Amino acid sequence: MDAATLTYDTLGFGEFEDFPETSEPVWILGKEFNALTEKDDILSDVTSRLWFTYRKNFPPIGGTGPTSDTGWGCMLRCGQMILGEALVCRHLGRDWRWVRGQPPRGEYIGILNAFLDKKDSYYSLHQIAQMGVGEGKSIGQWYGPNTVAQVLKKLTVFDSWSRLAVHVAMDNTVVMKEIKQLCMPWLDYGGAACAEPPGWMPTHNGCLEGACALAEEETALWKPLVLLIPLRLGLSDINKAYIETLKQCFQLPQSLGVIGGKPNSAHYFIGYVGEELIYLDPHTTQSAVEPCEDSQVPDDTYHCQHPPCRMHICEIDPSVAVGFFCRTEDDFDDWCMRIRKLSHTRGSLPMFELVDCQPSHFACSVDVLNLTPGKYQTLLSTFYLTCGGKGHSLDLSGKRHSLDLWGGVREGIFS
């Protein structure tokens, strides 16, 4: 894996000849660009994303563990990148741009501090690796997208500054009621509302005392949502019926991108052009960063200052997690409306279902996201035999199939 990776010191920063000369639109996290006339804008947008890579010479994980994550931490770094994008949207806004050498905002430094490679940073590699033990992953073991999503959900609980609501949608299903209960926990969904929200409102850390009061007001009635949707979009390869839907996710203004990649080699996908996905690659080993005496963070190595990497969409592993950020309830309602429109796109399949409430008859205990292709096919065959082969299609070439799961019919759970 390492033999094929770029080395930070050898990258040709500022060069853009690698990006295609095409009239096709370039989509990056909900923003559309013209590759012929807006190359500088594309590079600026890509460079402004937080780029988390392998690091070395950091304090041992757990006191006696690894001091580098080279070779095993790529999916953890991708998890940091998708969450880092959520924090940028939360505290700085999607249109914020990083400019090399420009004095940084306090919120930006606060975000970087949350990801430094040390045990007391909210989202450090140390925290993710140790929290992953509870998900059955030993330190140094490779993670899948679903495991990273579950770990990030647990870690955000301790971040009182960002006060995010993280929802991991399982079973290919997004339940709107569950999300609204999570983001507005003081509401009584039996009909009444509490007199006032519980006392979870934050105390800002020292470097962020001047945080905008308006931002607090905006989130007083809605905890900003990070929605992560782990998906399996095929067996060993992505089902081509999902390709257009996956691409259209990058067009949504709420897009946080996609974490996935190839087997045992994770990437953070931030957009697409034509049939190619645009991504940030964590497979570069850099030295761990220590804050300066004035609490500033040397940040050059947290931004990828070269043309973004690209991969044909058919090369992506079918196991992914798609991310979205909804700062307000209106953002979430808008996202729901857009997803419903996407579900009617001709010639493609929706990657997940959007429902008002969880069907009471459905309870799936099988972790399909972590099945190998062989076990996946065996499971499908088992359901086919159990159902007697009547009315339950197992066509994996792109057609939806319905399976009677524990008494309830679900469409596309194993698509």
Outline where the language-model segments fall.
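Cysteine-dependent deubiquitinase/ubiquitin-like isopeptidase catalytic cores across multiple families
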Residues: 1-68, 85-87, 91-388, 402-415
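Short polybasic linear motifs
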Residues: 388-389, 397
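Intrinsically disordered, low-complexity repeat/linker tracts enriched for polar/charged residues
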Residues: 392-394, 401
